[in-house]
Amino acid sequence: MNKDIATPIRTKEILKKYGFSFKKSLGQNFLIDTNILDRIVDHAEVTDETGVIEIGPGIGALTEQLAKRAKKVTAFEIDQRLLPILNDTLSPYDNVTIIHQDVLKADVGKVIEENFADCKEVMVVANLPYYVTTPIIMKLLEENLPLKGIVVMLQKEVADRMAAIPSSKEYNSLSIAVQYYTEAKTVMVVPKTVFVPQPNVDSAVIKLTVRETPAVSVENDEFFFQLIRASFGQRRKTLMNNLMNNLPDGKQHKAIIEEALQTADIDGKRRGESLSIEEFARLSNVLQKALF
């Protein structure tokens, strides 16, 4: 039986064997604690009927734990230097496929279709590189992929934002974007000491359960997100000020914006971070009708 990859000794051995040096630009921090990996897989509720997409497998620490429980694992790895290492470390598992590609440029829908046709459900489970966390998650959500959910390790601060509630310090446009598509919950905080090299920040694992239909009904989701970004433009400004300053031709549409706020029963003196997703949806539908 092979020793688990995610132990300090085995990780050190593997890195030494291949003369691997970390690339800061790729946000490479490898986990060296199998208990934490097991808990991540538990939170993802992976079974022998699950197809798993992993992003940034590193030397295969999480991949290995997923492969033990999932029907199939397909992992995207951008760093060519890791391919021979993964080939070696994951050789005992015949249910793993490695794709050498940047996931942001990949047709993930096609990969799901081709690799997971015989799986009952598809999950994304990953220890994400911190510098591209948000673009990766938003890509997965916006592409309306047939996912049951996403369980990922990321910077704690970003996890806090994704799961934040209105009027909290962390609540922003990312909170609403993520909660529009999913139910978000931070399930674990992970200290920096369980990584090599140690990151500068603490991490957290967030579980995003994909909703069957979005949290709110909006006429035009592109305008809905534009309105949200505008509302959070300058945090200390009122909603009315932010909308005038940040929506295209906002100042010219002052009267229309004022009337829309009134119709939606929202006080323009409030700040964007005090509005719930339902209030944003109401305002978006009224304002979109008035402007277009």
From Swiss-Prot:
Cellular compartment(s): Cytoplasm
EC number: 2.1.1.182
Reactions performed catalytically: adenosine(1518)/adenosine(1519) in 16S rRNA + 4 S-adenosyl-L-methionine = N(6)-dimethyladenosine(1518)/N(6)-dimethyladenosine(1519) in 16S rRNA + 4 S-adenosyl-L-homocysteine + 4 H(+)
Class of enzymatic activity (EC top level): transferase
Gene Ontology terms, MF aspect: 16S rRNA (adenine(1518)-N(6)/adenine(1519)-N(6))-dimethyltransferase activity; RNA binding
Keywords: Cytoplasm, Methyltransferase, RNA-binding, rRNA processing, S-adenosyl-L-methionine, Transferase
Predominant location category: cytoplasm
InterPro entries in the cross-refs: KsgA/Erm, rRNA_Ade_diMease-like_C, rRNA_Ade_Mease_Trfase_CS, rRNA_Ade_methylase_Trfase_N, rRNA_adenine_dimethylase, SAM-dependent_MTases_sf
GO cellular component: cytosol
Positions that bind S-adenosyl-L-methionine: 29, 31, 56, 77, 102, 127
Pfam families reported for this sequence: RrnaAD (PF00398)
Family: Belongs to the class I-like SAM-binding methyltransferase superfamily. rRNA adenine N(6)-methyltransferase family. RsmA subfamily.
Role played: Specifically dimethylates two adjacent adenosines (A1518 and A1519) in the loop of a conserved hairpin near the 3'-end of 16S rRNA in the 30S particle. May play a critical role in biogenesis of 30S subunits.
UniProt protein name: Ribosomal RNA small subunit methyltransferase A
Source organism (scientific name): Bacillus pumilus (strain SAFR-032)
